[in-house]
């Protein structure tokens, strides 16, 4: 059951990381995107995932998409936010003096990104990835609950709840924790 949840966790984590990095690059390089997209990114995290997950599962099932993808999308939804916030903070972390120095050397915006901004953002990225993988695991487990899955840690927790098997619930929780 752990492998089923791990697949959805990793798929959602990689999708969320890619989306988060791309959004962060756009937000840092485009003022209009900063003013328009960043508030929506922050607002997206105000709605509890337990309210959104059943809707995502139902909508995707209605168009014939079942299995790994709905769980991965729920995991992605939870894991992209820390990556966006961390990367925006990291890409904006170089001092103005460093940016001015690069411009003095006639650095292009791509050189500024690859030689200054991106290396400065790596510590922020890894801190964000640490938070993002945990959020992705939570998303995968939550995605298994309303889907009627028969395999996975969320399905084991749900089955334990149905049949009053507290050992099954706790074993799934401990497996998810480690």
Q: What spans do the regions from the language model cover?
A:
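Transmembrane-helix boundary motif in ABC transporter permease subunits
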Residues: 11-41
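Periplasmic/extracellular loop-to-transmembrane helix junction in inner-membrane transport proteins
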Residues: 1-14
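Membrane-helix interface segments
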Residues: 29-37, 65-69, 109, 165
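Transmembrane alpha-helices
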Residues: 73-77, 110-143, 175
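Short helix-capping/hinge motifs at transmembrane helix termini and TM-loop junctions
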Residues: 27-32, 56, 60-65, 146-151, ...
């Amino acid at each position: 059951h752990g492998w089923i949840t791990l697949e959805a966790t990793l798929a959602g984590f990689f999708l969320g990381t890619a989306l988060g990095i791309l959004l962060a690059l756009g937000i840092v390089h485009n003022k209009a995107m900063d003013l328009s997209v960043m508030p929506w990114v922050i607002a997206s995290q105000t709605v509890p995932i337990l309210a959104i997950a059943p809707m995502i599962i139902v909508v995707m099932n209605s168009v014939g998409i079942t299995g790994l993808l709905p769980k991965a999308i729920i995991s992605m939804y939870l894991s992209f936010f820390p990556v966006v916030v961390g990367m925006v903070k990291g890409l904006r972390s170089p001092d103005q003096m460093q940016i001015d120095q690069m411009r003095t050397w006639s650095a292009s915006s791509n050189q500024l990104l690859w030689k200054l901004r991106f290396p400065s953002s790596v510590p922020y990225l890894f801190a964000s990835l640490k938070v993002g993988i945990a959020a992705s695991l939570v998303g995968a487990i939550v995605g298994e609950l309303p889907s009627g899955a028969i395999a996975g840690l969320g399905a084991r927790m749900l089955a334990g709840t149905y049949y009053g098997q507290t050992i099954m619930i706790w074993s799934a929780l401990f497996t998810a924790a480690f």
